[in-house]
Amino acid sequence: MADTGAPGYRFTRLQFTRHDAKHDTQKAYRVNLAIPETPAPEEGFPLLIMLDGNAALMEVSADLLTELSQSAAPPVLAFLAHDNDLRIDGDARAYDYTPAVNESALSAKEQRPGREYGGADGYLSFITGKVIPAISDNTPVNPEKTGLWGHSYGGIFVLHALFTRPDSFAFYAPVDPSLWWGEGYILSEEHDLLAESPADIKDKSLLVLTGSGGEAKRRPRGDRDAATLAAVYKARESVPAGETARMVERLKAAGVDAQMTTLQGLSHGETLGASLPYVFRQFAR
């Protein structure tokens, strides 16, 4: 798609590096940027940033982009990914998308060689301080209408941004967020925000999408043996069933324009692609 474009949208690619202070290394990222072919409105285009940009872009059809180009407010779509050809870079996203927590809060599944967590604050600063300004230099963007989409761990990141730096975006779209991660740590961030500064999120827009089909059945493989899978399911029990819906209701009561939609019959993994048309259409209204 990024090579061919679609009627109504053209693509360009931006490259980025950022310094990871924890490891004293440079990390590379890229954004496949889909820009409406229509003239930009005076205030600039809305901008929607997608985490796991490689995976998200693989799920977007030319027909969907053409439909979007004809909407009331066609957005610029920024597919942000680690600079490789992996659909999902599991280790890189685990670090970039998760908040810093005490290691004791991590499940056995999460505590595995080569996987680190806790880089979300630095990654959010990278997005707001470097990625968005570079996009704005490339095409006119409306700073009052920016959005962030993320799935699973990416959903944690979206909520972390809302709960800790709500002015980063106007529209937040977490898809099947892994609320169980870190023994429900993200819910403690929500609690702190609502207790200390609920006015900070008043009038923000939140669209939460979840699946109803649960986890697709998995066979043990490689490092995901039966014991590891058991740890996964145990970790998910750290957050009561229905907590996502209750979180949405709490945020709605605090003044957030919050809604939740269930994608019927879809497993956690299937919600990634299925959520995109719904989110795009809501954002472009």
Q: Can you describe what each PLM-predicted range is?
A:
Residues 43-126, 130, 134, 138:
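Serine-hydrolase catalytic machinery in alpha/beta-hydrolase-like enzymes
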Residues 176, 180-262:
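The feature captures the conserved acid-bearing segment of alpha/beta-hydrolase catalytic domains
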